[in-house]
Amino acid sequence: MTLRIVSGRSGTGKSVFIHQEIVEQLKSDPLGHPIFIIVPDQMSYSTEYELTNRHGLQGLIRAQVMTFKRLAWLVLQETGGIARKEVNGYGYRMLIRKLLEEQKSEFSLFRQAAGKRGFTEEIETLLKEFSRYSVNSSVLAEVKESLKAIDAPNTLQAKTNDLYVVLQALEERLGTTYVDSEGYYPILTEQLKYAETMKQATIYIDGFTAFTVRELELVRELLKVTKHVTVVLPFDHIDEAFDEQALFHEAALTNQRLHDIANEEGIDVEPPLHFYYTQRFQSEDLQHVEANFANMVPHTKKTSGDVMVFEASNRRAEVHAIAREITKLTREYGYRYQDIVLLYRQAELYDPLITSIFQQYEIPIFTNTKKTMLHHPLIELSRSALEIMTSNWKYEPVFRSVKTDLFFPLQAELTIWRERADRLENYCLAQGIYGERWFEEPRWFYKKYRGLEFHSRVQTDEERAMQAEIEAIRDEIRQPLKSLQDKLSIASTGKDIATALFELVESLQVYEKLQAMKDRELERGDALAASEHEQAWNEWINVLDQFVYMFGEQEMSVEEAAKILDEGFDTLEFSRIPPTLDEVMVATVDLARLSNIKVAFVLGMNDGVYPTRMEYEGLLSDTEREWFSQIGYELAPTSSNRLLQENFLFYRAASTPSNKLYLTYPTADEEGKALLSSLYIKKFIGNDKIAGLLSGVQAERVVMDPIELLDESALPYLRHPRTALAHLMVQLRQAEHSRELAPEWLALQKFYQQDPYWALIFDRVHYPITHKNEAEPLETYITQELYGQKLTSSVSRIEKYFRCPFSHFTTYGLRLEERAEYRLETFAMGDLFHEALKWITEETHRLQLSWIRLTKQQIKQLARQAVEQIVPVFSHQILLSSARYRYIQRKLIRIVERTMMALTQHANVSHFKPIAIEASFGPGQHEQLPPLEIDLTSGKKMFMRGRIDRIDSATIDDRSYLRIVDYKSSARDLDLNEVYYGLSLQVLTYLDVAMENSTYWLPGETEPAGVLYVHVHNPMLKLDKDMTDSEIEEDRLKQYKMKGLLSENAESILSMDEQLEESSGHSKIIPVYMKKDGTPSESQSRIVPVNDMKRLQHFVRRKHQEAGNGILSGDTAISPYKLKSKTACDYCQFAAVCQFDPSDGKQNYRQLMQAKPNEIVDKIRKEIE
């Protein structure tokens, strides 16, 4: 029973010495008494590798590499103390989640936080810390009393009490039946003296700088029981134990504690074995850095070039620079990948970059960062299936489960079934399928949505076929989930719930499907991905086992079980087999324990990262930990103590390699925000005021794109053809615009063009640079296939063509459309308003009610009845689907009511009366009016169809006048510039149709009176507190003033607003200002001469003709217009299709010139005449 301390700075050969000593013992007596080498988890594989591969051993029999937990298993197997069932990480997390729910009423501080996501993990972390430092519920009870006696803060007392409640409940639940991962330590400490194997054992402990209280108790017991204990510690002087600022303070303090234990237990302490001279370093620079790192005023040495610093423009440029340097080291200097390590923090930022960028350079890597299993299909299926049950079949969890592919038949062609599932998803999104709607058969009646015409149109054969497909894939999903729902509805215990979930997975043949996935990955040569499916299955089974262990006989709801299982699934991670190939090691600075490394890259050397900024102190703050320390209870170090350890962690990283050290840092993050370099960078290279460890080291600036550099400086960026190709493309694009290609880049281009493998890739990547983003005209036979022999069009289609021919092609040729969703769209509200006003007009006609004489009460009743009549057949009953939409329904009724009141007031002062409502025109049999026929070239015709909201007429001096009134759910006016360029043709087309078919309603000759817009809305008014009710109504009426364009005819204008006969000035209802002489003001009114109104009609026909000819000629030009600040791309849904880029000098908007209204009328007059 002896203790020996082996000490020394990094690289002095401590581990090498004990390995050689162990090897000598094994060679001299292979079957002698056991030797145990105890190391941290992350060192176990590398230590075994060192002992066998580097010392010529064929295997280990007498010696075993152990972690403390593996030692516990070994001892307890011998002594019989292993009878307890182990609660592993996910079982422990699930148990804590359950206890937090159960004890919520007992909490004084944690009550609100207990159910929040993440809090379980916080509690788990602290309870494990308590376990490591021997703080059980009895100790915590003493802590409570002590804190109360010294009048500690109330918050700390309340927190301690809540922690006591949780810890006591945890201990009661574990009892003598279960043990958690930390619970082995006290059992091992208790059982160690009964293990015969240990009594003659020799123990080596390596890789630790400090021990927790539990570990120290175990080391104490090892000293008492075993024959010999050697502990390897990295420190220089024993006096460093008394200096918190010392580099090796923690390890020296551990040395002091071990000596104290030996003295207390009467253990012999051998003379310390201290190593003074470094053996690791093949570089004078690195040897100098190690020796002088701790010095406040370091001795400066001229660099020999083995320490380099990269200053990168961002993290991506930083990782690219490292990949290039590794490529250089392996190609030109003979290093192997396994000689190189990347050390970093901020794994969440660097892992995706390292993985993707190193793939581009074909550099194999091994990372010890574990990947979560949360996104594996089996885990996602389990979580989403339970969420479906607890969320009433909401859309999101249903289709998360569907996208796992596990509902599809075992031998299914995945591409086909995924497309079917996508169509089902689109249907459910459009129809608002959730909850009981999954089981309401009428909901699954498929027709392509046609607004309010949905119920009146007959289902086509194509729609029937689509319905059959949707129902088939629906049943594949619905039936297993319904079976799960039925089983869970009668489940009462945790075991019942786990069994129901298992049976769902079993019924879907998930195990067989995972095996098929594994086989496909192996066929692709991805052994790592293949292993993940087997790991996921095994871990999923373990989670269910742990759940049943803990809660099998307990009564619980599905909601509660889902939350507990979710905590378990949240802890699952994929493990990776240690590297056996030649791979670059990627490891975190804090956990890495590495040997035989020649080159190290330390990434992300920024301020706040090295040393780390201690922003979060945990569930117990530093101040609260100090209260614990004050009353004699040790816990894990405070953040300030951890900060003191930062120097040692970086020292260990910097002294890891034997040959070369690279320190790299970005100067900006992904958003361009500036980042400062770490103070350790200054320590190495110094600055203007302070000398660094090494002189002559300059931070090498690396950028993402070498175009920022001189041509010679760009050459190092061309280390791999795959990444160099991207840089060449940037150069070629620049050469297109501004400069010739430099000889270096021309040579690179020649390489790609001549290499058999890269030539095809080069041509494919180079194509977008030389190719103009132009759409070629369609051939005649294609236009006929797309648009048919007989072209039928709407005004909105023609307007889309004039906005951008390619946009027209995507909508009407390719028939692209956005995915429909179950929500109230703006255009749908417009349909509702139109239908409501139509219904009111027809209802007043049926009841023989005059709009002029309608009372407010009648208007309110008619508005309510109109909307209520429409709602059941409107947009799949969306206004009945939720309380929010029912509120919107009431708002819509109010809008119709307000608009009706305004329209009745308009009617009171107007001679114009409606003669047609919702007048449809087109080639169909059910249309009220014939189509507007447009003659095209080659003898073809285009037939225009549409629906006119309202046609009004008035008879003045035996002459009839017609006007168009169009209802809009947003404010609108007629811009003659937009008319001229074909962007706004609707109301003038409607006027043309009405004039052409005027004899349907009116005898004799008819004149155009104008076109007007009514804004259907409920206006917000700015009220004065002194305003009367009549003034408020008058102000509201102003908000309904119609906009548009009228014929310059005083008689027809006065007939629209009789009040203008009594007084001059602005009309309250039409866009006219009447002068005192009884004529309208041209400058303050929206009017044109009658003949010009007729010319506008003819001009609009010409625009239709121009568009029709363009469409049939196959025009698909990517030519979006720009008029003032408006462009065709503003609300275009298909920008990703055309890839129009106005920043590219080759692509430009079709610029339309703005002109005054009278200038536009003059231009039209000239063109028509």
Swiss-Prot record:
Gene: addB
Binding positions for ATP per the UniProt entry: G8, R9, S10, G11, T12, G13, K14, S15
MF terms in GO: 4 iron, 4 sulfur cluster binding; 5'-3' exonuclease activity; ATP binding; double-stranded DNA binding; helicase activity; metal ion binding
HAMAP family to which the protein is assigned, alphabetical: AddB_type1
NCBIfam families (UniProt xref): addB_Gpos (TIGR02773)
Oligomer and partners: Heterodimer of AddA and AddB.
Residue positions binding [4Fe-4S] cluster: C804, C1129, C1132, C1138
Coiled coil: none
Organism domain of life: Bacteria
Pfam families hit by this protein: ADDB_N (PF21445), PDDEXK_1 (PF12705)
Cofactors that this protein relies on: Mg(2+); [4Fe-4S] cluster
Record's miscellaneous remark: Despite having conserved helicase domains, this subunit does not have helicase activity.
Keywords carried by this UniProt record: 4Fe-4S, ATP-binding, DNA damage, DNA repair, DNA-binding, Exonuclease, Helicase, Hydrolase, Iron, Iron-sulfur, Metal-binding, Nuclease, Nucleotide-binding
Family: Belongs to the helicase family. AddB/RexB type 1 subfamily.
GO biological process terms held by the UniProt record: double-strand break repair via homologous recombination
Domain UvrD-like helicase C-terminal, residue spans: 276-582
Role this protein plays: The heterodimer acts as both an ATP-dependent DNA helicase and an ATP-dependent, dual-direction single-stranded exonuclease. Recognizes the chi site generating a DNA molecule suitable for the initiation of homologous recombination. The AddB subunit has 5' -> 3' nuclease activity but not helicase activity.
Protein name, entry field: ATP-dependent helicase/deoxyribonuclease subunit B
Cofactor binding remark: Binds 1 [4Fe-4S] cluster.
EC number(s) from the headed UniProt entry: 3.1.-.-
Chain ranges of the UvrD-like helicase ATP-binding domain: 1-296
